[in-house]
Design a protein with these regions (language model features):
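Membrane-interface helix-loop junctions in multi-pass transporters/channels
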Residues: 1-121
Length: 121
C-alpha cells in the first residue's frame, strides 16, 4: 500500500513541479533558475508543515514522501548551480546555492511555525 501512495503522490508532485517550473520560466526569463528556486523553497515550507502536522503514516507517505519528494528537486538544483559556475555566472551561482540552502532551512522552520499557529501540532 505504501508503494502505491508514494507512486501516486510522486506522480502528482512531479506534474506540479513541471507545470509550475514551466510557468515561472515562461514568465521570468533570467539567468537565475527562479523556477527550481521557488519550487524548492515552497517545498521546504510545505515539508515543515507536513512533518509537524502529526499526520497518520499513510497520509504522510502520500504527501511527504510522495508528493513533496517529487515536487522538490535536489538534482536539478545541483545541475543548475554547476551550470551557472561553468557559464561564469559566479555571483548568480553563489546567490542561488546559498540562497536555496539558507531560505530552505528558514522555510522549513516557517512551515513548522505555521503548523503550530493553526494548531496542527
Amino acid at each position: 500500500m505504501q508503494y502505491l501512495l508514494v507512486a501516486a503522490g510522486g506522480a502528482m508532485g512531479s506534474l506540479t513541479r513541471f507545470i509550475i517550473g514551466r510557468k515561472i520560466s515562461e514568465k521570468f526569463t533570467t539567468g537565475f533558475p527562479l523556477g527550481t528556486f521557488f519550487i524548492n523553497i515552497t517545498g521546504a515550507v510545505l515539508l515543515g508543515i507536513v512533518s509537524s502536522a502529526g499526520l497518520e503514516v499513510n497520509r504522510y507517505t502520500l504527501i511527504g514522501d510522495g508528493f513533496l519528494g517529487a515536487y522538490t528537486t535536489f538534482s536539478t538544483f545541483m545541475y543548475e548551480g554547476f551550470n551557472l559556475f561553468q557559464d561564469n555566472e559566479k555571483l548568480n551561482a553563489l546567490a542561488y546555492i546559498l540562497g536555496s540552502l539558507i531560505l530552505g532551512i528558514i522555510g522549513f522552520m516557517f512551515g513548522v511555525e505555521i503548523a503550530r499557529m493553526i494548531k496542527i501540532i
